[in-house]
């Protein structure tokens, strides 16, 4: 069953964050990951939304998503994200 990695971010260093954007997708592909929503303006329907960006990536299973998150391929992009943005990541099951 497909799962979704959802990340909410506030960019602190837009110049260096471009390196993250360039490297993250290649790190996901080996694990069957792909973006289904990435960046762009967020249209808040209710309440407060604390972050300026939302990213949703689809993986074929929770195991593949966790393998990617802990993988050597994602190590450099993860370090870039942590250095250039405040973020939260969760995994949710698809239906």
List each language-model region with its residue ranges.
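C-terminal end-helix/capping segment
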Residues: 82-95
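Short S/T/G/P-rich N-terminal loop/turn motif that feeds into the first structured element of a domain
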Residues: 1-56, 60-70, 74, 93-95
